[in-house]
């Protein structure tokens, strides 16, 4: 499961996710990717399930980049515990995602395979996504 090795503080405030992604909103490594269209928290398990779906469909060809990392600690109080008496114990980590954020990137496979692999990955995620292609990628001459 994805999580930081060490954090400065064990607990963090929930915060608000407003606006669009200011960073990580363009393809940097691969020719294809999926971009978020919603704000949501994505857990390490969801990221890993999507990554496995991509690599299995691509049959270990090409390369996959995961552009997000769950570094925000989430806390939860025990069952049946009343309100107050402090914040709960850390339960896990999430990656806060805003619209426009690139989640996965793929390189080294044809357009159709990349599109289907990323569609399968998108089904594992709690956000609606959009398939994006690098602006200088030529779909007609991909095998040339």
UniProtKB/Swiss-Prot annotation:
GO terms for MF: rRNA binding; structural constituent of ribosome; tRNA binding
Provenance organism: Porphyromonas gingivalis (strain ATCC BAA-308 / W83)
Coiled-coil regions listed: none
Protein's recorded name: Large ribosomal subunit protein uL16
Family matches, as Gene3D superfamilies: Ribosomal protein L10e/L16 (3.90.1170.10)
InterPro entries in UniProt: Ribosomal_uL16 (IPR047873), Ribosomal_uL16_bact-type (IPR000114), Ribosomal_uL16_CS (IPR020798), Ribosomal_uL16_dom (IPR016180), Ribosomal_uL16_sf (IPR036920)
Disulphide-bonded residues: none
Stated family: Belongs to the universal ribosomal protein uL16 family.
SUPFAM superfamilies in the cross-refs: Ribosomal protein L16p/L10e
Described function: Binds 23S rRNA and is also seen to make contacts with the A and possibly P site tRNAs.
PROSITE patterns found in the cross-reference section: RIBOSOMAL_L16_2 (PS00701)
UniProt record, GO biological process: translation
One GO term describing the cellular component: cytosolic large ribosomal subunit
PANTHER family: 50S/60S RIBOSOMAL PROTEIN L16 (PTHR12220), LARGE RIBOSOMAL SUBUNIT PROTEIN UL16M (PTHR12220:SF13)
Complex formation: Part of the 50S ribosomal subunit.
Alphabetically ordered keywords of this record: Ribonucleoprotein, Ribosomal protein, RNA-binding, rRNA-binding, tRNA-binding
Keyword Ribosomal protein: yes
């Amino acid at each position: 499961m994805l999580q930081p090795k060490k954090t400065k503080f064990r607990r963090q405030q929930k915060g608000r996710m407003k606006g669009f992604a200011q960073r990580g909103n363009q393809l940097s490594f691969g020719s294809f990717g999926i971009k978020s269209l919603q704000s949501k928290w994505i857990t390490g398990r969801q990221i890993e399930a999507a990554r496995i779906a991509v690599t299995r469909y691509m049959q270990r060809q090409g390369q996959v980049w995961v552009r997000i990392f769950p570094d925000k600690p989430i806390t939860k109080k025990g069952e049946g515990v009343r309100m107050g008496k402090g914040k709960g114990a850390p339960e896990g980590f999430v990656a806060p995602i805003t619209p426009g954020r690139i989640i996965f990137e793929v390189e080294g496979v044809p357009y159709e395979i990349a599109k289907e692999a990323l569609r399968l990955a998108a089904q594992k995620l709690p956000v609606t996504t959009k398939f994006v292609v690098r602006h200088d990628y030529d779909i007609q001459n991909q095998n040339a």
